[in-house]
Amino acid sequence: SSTVPLMRLGVFVPTLKSTNKAIAKKSNVGSNINASDDLRHLELAKSEGFERITISGPRLDMDTDFKVWTGIISVLTDNELESNEDGTISIRFTEFAMRCGFSRGRLKAEFREKIKDSLRKLMSNVVEFSKDRGTNIEVTKFVQLIGESTVDIGNDKVILTPSKTLKDLYVGEYKILLKLRALKALARKESAQALYTFIEALPPNPIPVSIERFRKRLSLTSRPALQNSTVRKALKQLEDIGYLEYQELKEGNKIAFQIIKRNPSLK
């Protein structure tokens, strides 16, 4: 089952540019979100039978906190990076900032403070798992969004430790981030977006996909020759953003496409 990203749960909200002090103050109060339906597939919830899952803590914004979260996710799910037995990973501060999507020009002292604020807020968010609430066999488990974090300016380092029980949450979030990145790269290219979601859901080493299947997926109404060129153009756009490697196969008047490789990270 696919993971629901934390941002769709409303954990991250747009920054209020309001001059109204009362509203701004209220937005800092924090949030308590019922995520039972969306996070019940997590290993911890399944293995220990937790029925209710909530996320509570300071409200997180899209401007900085969400970007820092994407940086954390990209570090904690990167198998190329060296980690010790509890999953702790050390990375250069400048590289961490780039993984968050911040430009190089932003690495000033004030910006470092912003990243520290975001880490503090993210670590103050707690995922609460509970079962048999209100009975005398009630069990409640509290897990921080991330285990530990260190910002070491002198050594140009950010050190992150995951919460072990949330490993599958990180992996699910990462998949969603890759998807968002691809869809952003395909802005206003609706046919390519639709084929992206279709191709990404295919199993590993898929059998060739007929052009008819692609046409059906796009629900096109134009004449077949035009539909075929729409499909080819969309596949070419997926190739251009670095997502897809494919080959067109022709046999008689049958046309199909062999999916050679998918690169969700658009490398």
Which stretches of residues belong to each language-model region?
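Charged, alpha-helix-forming regions
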Residues: 1-267
